[in-house]
Curated annotation (Swiss-Prot):
Domain of life: Eukaryota
Keywords: Golgi apparatus, Membrane, Transmembrane, Transmembrane helix, Transport
Name of the gene this protein is made from: dur3-3
Protein name: Probable urea active transporter 3
Described function: Involved in active transport of urea.
Membrane topology of this protein: Multi-pass membrane protein
The family this protein is said to belong to: Belongs to the sodium:solute symporter (SSF) (TC 2.A.21) family.
């Protein structure tokens, strides 16, 4: 067994010390925004950030939400196992779901701008029974993804520092809980930005050390030579055993499994819906597309730096596992990420690796906490128990659910660890068992002829079909052996993912045609959503969307999403796969240079654009600090009504005033 690179002090220091430090900073920021900028922590602000988040923060939130520990660990494992195409396939495949979800985000802003959760929309259209079905899928995804975030982070931190995995599992969400309870979704956006900036800094350091300053590698050409040499002693499954080719059948299967199976982890996870709801209408499309393209480079660059370094230095005494290669179990756990950073930078590299895993775990966990509490508050508590609950009561309830979930997700992560469930296994399971709800929510938002039975019957039938085909194909491809290991083989996963996702679509369409009902007017959905009675003027006014802008943005979003899909999963990888091309040294130089430039652009955008968009607030706070400005008083509900009335034409003032009052 490989000894831990760092001692337990690093693990506890980062998890507890840094966790509480971030919590204190976020709580302080929340106080400043409340005290000096006039942000009120009402029920609408806690769950939707007053639907006022701008493009830059939406982009950083997308990057943060999709940068799981599994993102960094699994992409590194794929890069170590398959070479240059491993992290490429991972990043390309998972980017597709983000760009397609842009379309969902835009449609939510068009037809249901007053919604608090994406699950609420199903109830507004189809009623209680359909709502209960999709609630099961949304909470199932939310709970499993949350546990997976902590599982990946706690296992990796334990492996590199020796910190007990149970302690890591329960302590990781503690600091997150503190600032999430204090600041709600807005604090999540702010922590997303902070965490993401740090992740980009670590990635850039790793890239430049690997390809410019490392005494063991130090140049692109040296990396090429080392990868060529290691393929002779430890060949890959790719063409001629090379790690410098995209021609690898196993990698293609894994990539397409991610493309299909990954949709459920985005479309069914209410945390992504929360970000769509929180965005300003005109910010949704730009924020999601820019965030998706900025995220794409995170696993690609990290795999190309840390994991390829780990692979290239296999026969060098500096390797953590020298003289042996990294074991298949360690590869499946994503350890090439940490081992590669350790080989490049020693204990400093290992500490940096633990740091970004901590950032990935806690930032995404915060979003999941808010999503769970929002769904439980609005879709369960207010829907089934207290329809007339006040805004203050809803805030108290969200705090309770955030607290409960913070404890439960840690317990589930520990359970997964002890029964031997891996991150890749969980991702596969979500795609197969919960994937049918992808078309359930998509058609709910877009197809007027879909009826409630499509959701009630079609989605569960799709899940059953996917699981049955998954187990059956596992039995066939694994010579009759069905267990948690054989269920995670690429061919069985492919069958389960495809049948689970697309059988759900078929069932929903057939059921909707066999049991037709009156086509719904999707434009009337927003009338069924009720804002909290403590909503401020801005929240009330912003609930009325700019429909013409959104119509145009939706058309652009659909077109761009399909273009990105074809480029990333067909036009770029498949011709390279079919050509059986092994990278030349010149081509590899260009490949790495593109990665470095892309990373720099993404890092600069995510770091500075949110600051640029918030420049007025920053200047205002600076003036407050030197006594040249006065903090406004937050508006109450009566003030909100007056502001709204004044914004209307004279003919509509009396009617609207009566509606509000």
């Amino acid at each position: 067994m490989t000894e831990t690179v760092l001692n337990q002090g690093y693990g506890y220091g980062i998890v507890i010390g840094l966790g509480f430090a971030f919590a204190i900073v976020m709580i302080l920021v929340t106080y400043v925004l409340k005290r000096y900028v006039g942000e009120v922590q009402d029920s609408e602000h806690f769950t939707t950030a007053s639907r006022s988040v701008k493009t830059g923060l939406i982009s950083s939130a997308v990057v943060s939400s999709w940068t799981w520990p599994g993102t960094l660990l699994t992409s590194a494992g794929m890069a170590y196992e398959y070479g240059v195409c491993g992290s490429m396939w991972y990043s390309f495949a998972f980017t597709v779901q983000i760009t397609f979800f842009t379309v969902i985000a835009l449609q939510v802003k068009r037809v249901a701008p007053g919604a608090h959760t994406i699950v609420e929309i199903v109830k507004a259209r189809f009623g209680q029974a359909s709502h209960a079905v999709f609630l099961f899928y949304a909470l199932g995804t939310n709970i499993i993804v949350s546990a997976m975030l902590l599982l990946g982070g706690s296992q990796a931190i334990s492996a590199i520092t020796g910190m007990h995995v149970v302690a890591a599992g329960f302590l990781l969400p503690l600091g997150v809980w503190l600032y999430t309870v204090s600041g709600g979704l807005k604090s999540t956006f702010l922590s997303d930005w902070t965490h993401t900036v740090i992740v980009y800094i670590v990635i850039l350091i790793t890239l430049f050390v690997a390809y410019t300053s490392s005494v063991h590698i130090g140049s692109i050409d040296k990396m090429y030579d080392l990868l060529t040499e290691v393929s002779k002693t430890n060949p890959s499954t790719g063409y001629k055993g090379s790690y410098l080719t995209v021609t690898n059948r196993d990698a293609v299967f894994v990539g397409w499994n991610i493309v299909i199976g990954g949709f459920a982890t985005v479309f069914c996870d209410p945390s992504y819906g929360q970000k769509a709801i929180a965005a300003k209408p005109i910010s949704a499309m730009k924020g999601y597309f820019a965030g998706g393209l900025a995220w794409l480079i995170v696993p690609w660059a990290m795999g190309s730096a840390a994991a390829l370094s780990c692979l290239a230095l296999t026969n060098n005494p500096v390797s953590v596992t020298y003289p042996d290669p990294v074991s298949s179990k360690q590869v499946s756990e994503g350890m090439p990420l940490l081992y590669g950073m350790t080989a490049l930078m020693g204990k400093n590299g290992a500490a940096a690796g633990v740091l970004i895993l901590f950032m990935a775990s806690t930032s995404a966990t915060s979003a999941e906490l808010v999503a769970f509490s929002s769904v439980m508050t609005y879709d369960v508590y207010r829907n089934y128990f207290r329809p007339n609950a006040s805004g203050k009561e809803l805030v108290r309830v969200t705090h309770v659910f955030v607290t409960i979930f913070a404890v439960c997700m840690g317990a589930l992560a520990v359970l997964f660890n002890y029964i031997g469930i891996t991150i890749s296994w969980i991702i596969t399971f979500i795609g197969i068992a919960l994937g049918p709800a992808v078309f359930g929510i998509t058609l709910t938002l877009f197809w007027k002829k879909m009826n409630k039975y499509g959701m009630i019957i079609g989605c569960p039938m799709g899940s059953i079909t996917g699981v049955v085909c998954w187990v059956g194909s596992c039995y066939k491809f694994s010579n009759g052996v069905v267990n948690k290991t054989t269920l995670n083989t690429p061919y069985a996963n492919a069958v389960g993912n495809f049948t689970g996702l697309f059988s759900g679509l078929i069932y929903i369409v057939l059921i909707s045609y066999f049991f037709p009902n009156k086509s719904d007017d999707l434009n009337n959905l927003n009338e069924k959503f009720v804002l909290g009675d403590d909503a401020t003027a801005e929240e009330i006014v912003d609930a009325e969307t700019e429909k013409k802008q959104l119509d145009r943005s939706l058309r652009i979003g659909i077109f761009v999403s399909w273009i990105i899909f074809f480029i990333l999963v067909i036009i770029v990888p498949l011709p390279m796969y079919g050509s059986k091309y092994i990278f030349s040294k010149l081509f590899f130089r260009g490949w790495i240079i593109v990665i470095i430039i892309w990373t720099l652009i993404a890092a600069l955008y995510i770091t500075f654009y949110p600051l640029y968009e918030s420049r007025d607030t920053i200047v205002y706070l600076c003036k407050l600090a030197i006594g040249k400005a006065k903090a406004p008083e937050p508006m109450n509900y009566v003030d909100a009504v007056e502001v709204e009335i004044e914004s209307l034409s004279d003919d509509d003032k009396e009617k609207k005033a009566n509606d509000f009052l």
